């Protein structure tokens, strides 16, 4: 029992049980999609969730992102920044639509922390949509430490 306690104390002292941010990215040569997400987190702590879309030549149409809706169940939030111009949801996906930004890059942040009642992590997926079909997608997993 003392060995287990010592390992937990050591892990905490070396920040192994703190928040770690991961990055998942993909490109098709023209469009790029990058997601930053809480790879390891603990309840009550602020975390990073961010999506970046880049496209040389800018954006002529709204940007539509789909996120598996169950991923957000572990968070308390103040919302998205910028706020979506339109949101819809089906049984699996939360669709976020944003007005086209100036320039070649779009960035959205999700201001959130892990709910105190969250005990298990989640798998996540972000899709950059092209109409009703995904153009690019990234997947990731958040693990919650005790």
Where in this protein do the model-derived segments appear?
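A eukaryote-biased signal for short, well-structured alpha-helical docking elements
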Residues: 1-28
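Short extracytoplasmic
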Residues: 29-67
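Solvent-exposed, conformationally flexible loop/turn segments
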Residues: 43-46, 89-91, 101-105
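Hydrophobic beta-strand positions in extracellular immunoglobulin-like domains
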Residues: 52-55, 112, 128
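Short aromatic-acidic-glycine turn motif
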Residues: 69-82, 133-135
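Low-complexity, intrinsically disordered segments enriched in Ser/Thr together with acidic residues
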Residues: 102-119
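Serine/threonine-enriched low-complexity regions used as flexible
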Residues: 118-138
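Short beta-strand edge segments in extracellular beta-sheet folds
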Residues: 141-146
């Amino acid at each position: 029992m003392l060995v287990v306690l010592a390992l937990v104390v050591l892990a905490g002292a070396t920040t192994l049980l703190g928040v770690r941010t991961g990055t998942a990215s993909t490109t098709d040569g023209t469009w790029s999609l990058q997601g930053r997400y809480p790879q390891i987190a603990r309840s009550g702590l602020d975390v990073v969730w961010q999506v970046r879309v880049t496209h040389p030549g800018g954006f002529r149409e709204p940007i539509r992102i789909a996120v598996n809706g169950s991923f957000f169940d572990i968070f308390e939030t103040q919302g998205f920044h910028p706020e979506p111009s339109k949101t819809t949801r089906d049984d699996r996906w939360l669709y976020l639509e944003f007005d086209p930004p100036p320039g070649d890059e779009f960035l959205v942040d999700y201001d959130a922390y892990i709910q105190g009642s969250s005990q298990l992590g989640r798998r996540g997926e972000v899709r950059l949509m092209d109409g009703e079909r995904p153009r690019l997608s990234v997947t990731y997993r958040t693990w919650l430490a005790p």
